[in-house]
């Protein structure tokens, strides 16, 4: 079995979320997508209230994620989305976080980023107490001495089959709205060569952790069609963003 690898150019918020949902719904093989955000945007966790972010600067692009957790200001970062059948991950949610976060720690370590998976603290929750994801390091998060470096969240569905979408964001440069977060640039680099090397290492380490063979690919025609539909009918719609 292969892990299909999609490495995309930075995209708009609605498009990014639409593609990830299309992969969760239609992907016939495990798929890892690596991408960025242009323009920079704020994503809200599935359970968050949009009204809690009324103080964002005018013109800030906001989108709702399919996954839970706190809001993220997506700036200069590497975002990954893993769409995979549930039986290819540990049944326990926390164990699946550990598997994937350990792979991320190994990837970052090869680039000289001093980080670790937090073994203490509160367990992961889809409904965080702080509105910002990176303000609240919890058990199994990837952290540096300066704070949380990797924010993750999941969505698990049972129909048409048991599937998981795992989102992760690794901060390269501190974003404007959340300048207190940790970033790879704090200790090493956050430039384009670093980004490319990190993407390569993440893909290699995730494939090894999942015991899959890495295979570059692209969106299928049905996935692309569904993503375009979801972008227009869901993720670009203000009512969907504000539905909580």
Predicted regions and their residues:
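Short, solvent-exposed loop/turn segments at the edges of secondary structure
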Residues: 75-77, 137, 165
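A glycine-rich, hydrophobic loop/mini-helix early in the fold
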Residues: 49-91
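Contiguous, small/hydrophobic- and glycine-enriched helical/loop subdomains that border
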Residues: 79-129
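Short, conserved charged micro-motifs
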Residues: 54, 89-93, 178-181, 197
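Aromatic/basic-lined ligand-recognition segments
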Residues: 136-143, 147-157
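Long, positively charged amphipathic alpha-helical accessory segments at protein N-termini or as interdomain linkers
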Residues: 105-126, 153-244
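Active-site loop/lid in soluble adenylation, ligation, and acyl-transfer enzymes
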Residues: 1-57, 64-65, 133, 194-244
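Charged, often glycine-rich, active-site loop that binds/positions anionic groups
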Residues: 126-139
């Amino acid at each position: 079995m292969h892990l299909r690898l999609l490495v995309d150019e930075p995209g708009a918020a609605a498009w990014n979320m639409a593609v990830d949902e299309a992969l969760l719904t239609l992907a016939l093989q495990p798929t890892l997508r690596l991408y960025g955000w242009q323009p920079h945007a704020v994503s809200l966790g599935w359970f968050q209230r949009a009204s809690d972010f009324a103080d964002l600067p005018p013109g800030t692009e906001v989108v709702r994620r399919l996954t839970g957790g706190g809001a993220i200001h997506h700036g200069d970062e590497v975002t990954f989305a893993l769409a995979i059948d549930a039986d290819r991950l540990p049944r326990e949610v926390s164990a699946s976080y550990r598997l994937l976060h350990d792979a991320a720690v190994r990837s970052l370590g090869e680039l000289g980023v001093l980080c670790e998976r937090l073994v203490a603290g509160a367990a992961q929750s889809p409904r965080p107490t702080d509105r910002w994801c990176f303000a609240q390091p919890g058990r199994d998060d990837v952290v540096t001495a300066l704070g949380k470096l990797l924010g993750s969240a999941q969505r698990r569905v049972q129909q048409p089959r048991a599937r998981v979408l795992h989102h992760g964001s690794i901060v390269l440069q501190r974003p404007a709205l959340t300048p207190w977060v940790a970033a790879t640039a704090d200790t090493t680099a956050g430039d384009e060569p670093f980004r490319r090397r990190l993407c390569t290492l993440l893909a290699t380490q995730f494939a090894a952790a999942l015991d899959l063979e890495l295979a570059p690919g692209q969106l299928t025609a049905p996935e692309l069609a569904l993503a375009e539909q979801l972008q227009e009918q869901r993720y670009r719609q203000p009512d969907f963003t504000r539905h909580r």
